[in-house]
């Protein structure tokens, strides 16, 4: 990708630099927001300038690292006044409270919770601020590197599994897939989770096409030929972000509205064989919290006999919560649902309208009466009964003969 969601300069251990891409301005404007403190991390997560469970965990962890380095090197900074730096026990107490505050930015995303628990453990075992800084730096670097490696594994695991299933079913033609929200490079350290599987399927398709064109392999076999990303209201992560990534990678795709899924499945010239979605939290029985609209997609896939897969690293699995009934679902500000935010364009030719500084102008357009009541949950819960497989870096987990997932090996 030409755009990185997170820019982390780790060249200087004692003076790291962190910037995150303001994804609210995509696809027309590229602007990075610097992260110096936990407050900065909280702000970009809460406002959804950064989103995607893996990316949220990474940015949250990085914001802790930048704050720790700031108070260590600049004890007169504003944020340093929150701490009693002469007393390590007092400093740890304040840091623990700051970590709890950071978690409140996105309570549904278990990756952030898991990362902050790990950071609290590092804090507990650290003898002083310098030791904590060094251990935290190593943890964050490992978190980022492992996320990218695991994304590649998930992509290949999911692609191979679907191709094998289709071959066993005797399907040998071109097929399409569905996806919702954004689960690609912009939601992770790179490559993506659900969109990573789609990238791997596209690589497989290109390789098969090359072999066929060169005469090395004339046998018909299943290959992905098209992707249908859902727009994903009300924040339009599908139209703003996933569509951007698909266009950049030159993967054949057609954007569809959330309300047109069933009709698209019924009328698609290319048979739709699977849906791949990400996850913000997967509990012990496989129930999954993900972007609002995921449950609707799962129900429709069940109706049409389309395979429905959740793609997430094992860090997204909550080994404490038994069922989805106990997941806390964040509700967004009702006002967000009454407007559409975007870049202003010239209606005659589609060109961007720029301000005096030459930057694209963004604005909000009201789409609902201000007096109307609004229910605006950020997520919904898909019961495990509607999920055909959970794709992780460890492999693809399917249900047993009793219709239950057995995820204990991932805990």
Curated annotation (Swiss-Prot):
GO terms for cellular component: cytoplasm; nucleus. Its EC number is 5.3.1.23. It is found in: Cytoplasm; Nucleus. InterPro entries: IF-2B-related, IF-M1Pi, IF_2B-like_C, Initiation_fac_2B_a/b/d, M1Pi_N, NagB/RpiA_transferase-like. The active site is at residue 280. The modification Phosphoserine is found at residue 351. One of its GO terms (molecular function) is S-methyl-5-thioribose-1-phosphate isomerase activity. Keywords: Acetylation, Amino-acid biosynthesis, Cytoplasm, Isomerase, Methionine biosynthesis, Nucleus, Phosphoprotein. The modification N-acetylserine is found at residue 2. NCBIfam families: eIF-2B_rel (TIGR00524), PRK05720.1 (NF004326), salvage_mtnA (TIGR00512). Belongs to the eIF-2B alpha/beta/delta subunits family. MtnA subfamily. This is Methylthioribose-1-phosphate isomerase.
């Amino acid at each position: 990708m030409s755009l990185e969601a997170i820019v982390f300069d780790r060249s200087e251990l004692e003076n790291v630099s962190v910037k995150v891409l303001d994804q609210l301005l995509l696809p027309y404007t590229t602007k990075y927001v610097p992260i110096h403190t936990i407050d900065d991390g909280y702000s970009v997560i809460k406002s959804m300038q950064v989103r995607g469970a893996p990316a949220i965990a990474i940015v949250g962890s990085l914001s802790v690292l930048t704050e720790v380095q700031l108070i260590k090197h600049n004890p007169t900074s504003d944020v340093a006044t929150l701490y009693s730096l002469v007393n390590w026990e007092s400093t740890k107490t304040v840091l623990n409270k700051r970590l709890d505050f950071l978690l409140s930015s996105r309570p549904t995303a278990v990756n952030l919770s898991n990362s902050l628990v790990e950071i609290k453990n590092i804090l507990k075992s650290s003898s002083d601020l310098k030791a904590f800084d060094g251990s935290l730096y190593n943890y964050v670097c490992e978190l980022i590197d492992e996320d990218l490696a695991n994304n590649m594994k998930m992509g290949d695991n999911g692609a191979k599994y679907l191709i094998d299933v289709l071959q066993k079913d005797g399907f040998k033609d071109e097929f399409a897939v569905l996806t919702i929200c954004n689960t690609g490079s912009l939601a992770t350290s790179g490559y993506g989770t659900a969109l990573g599987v789609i990238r791997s399927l596209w690589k497989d398709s290109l390789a098969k096409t090359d072999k066929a064109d060169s005469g090395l392999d004339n046998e018909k076999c299943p290959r992905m030929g098209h992707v249908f990303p859902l727009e994903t209201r009300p924040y339009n992560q599908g139209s703003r972000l996933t569509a951007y990534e698909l266009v950049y990678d030159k993967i054949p795709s057609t954007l569809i509205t959330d309300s047109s899924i069933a009709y698209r499945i019924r009328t698609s010239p290319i048979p739709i064989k699977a849906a791949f979605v990400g996850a913000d939290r997967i509990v012990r029985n496989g129930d999954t919290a993900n972007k609002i609209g995921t449950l609707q997609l799962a129900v429709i896939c069940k109706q049409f006999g389309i395979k429905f897969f959740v793609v997430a690293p094992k860090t997204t699995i909550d080994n404490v919560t038994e069922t989805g009934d106990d997941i806390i679902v964040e509700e967004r500000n009702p006002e967000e649902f009454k407007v559409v935010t975007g870049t202003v364009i010239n209606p005659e030719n589609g060109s961007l309208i720029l301000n005096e500084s030459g930057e694209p102008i963004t604005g909000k357009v009201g789409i609902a009466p201000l007096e109307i009541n609004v229910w605006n949950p950020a997520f919904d819960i898909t019961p495990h009964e509607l999920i055909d497989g959970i794709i992780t870096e460890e492999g693809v987990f399917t249900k047993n003969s009793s219709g239950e997932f057995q995820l204990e090996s991932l805990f």
